[in-house]
Amino acid sequence: MATKLSIIVFSIVVLHLLLSAHMHFLINVCAECETKSAIPPLLECGPRCGDRCSNTQYKKPCLFFCNKCCNKCLCVPPGTYGNKQVCPCYNNWKTKSGGPKCP
C-alpha cells in the first residue's frame, strides 16, 4: 500500500514540475512575441498589403491574398517583393500545387 501511495505522490510531483516548466516556456515565448515588430495588429494589414502590392499589375488578387495571409500569419514582409524570410508563416503557406500562397 505504501508503494502505491508513493507512486501516486511521485506522479503528482512530476506532473506539477512538467506543468511549471511548460508555463515558464509559454511565458518566455509570449514575451518574445510581443517584442517582434513584424507582427502588425489586424488593422494594419490593409496599408501593409497596399505597400506590398503597389508595384504589381495584378492589384486585386495580390491585395486579396496578401490580406488573407496577413490575417492568418499576422505578418507582411517589408517591401514589394521578396523578404519572405521575415515572416515564416507567410513564406511557408503553399497552394495545393506547391506554389507560394502569399504574394
Curated annotation (Swiss-Prot):
Cellular localization per UniProt: Secreted
N-terminal signal peptide: 1-20
GO biological process terms held by the UniProt record: gibberellic acid mediated signaling pathway
One cellular-component annotation, GO: extracellular region
Function recorded in the entry: Gibberellin-regulated protein that may function in hormonal controlled steps of development such as seed germination, flowering and seed maturation.
Family: Belongs to the GASA family.
Keywords of this entry: Disulfide bond, Gibberellin signaling pathway, Secreted, Signal
Main location group: secreted
Modification comment: Six disulfide bonds may be present.
Protein origin, superkingdom: Eukaryota
Record's protein name: Gibberellin-regulated protein 13
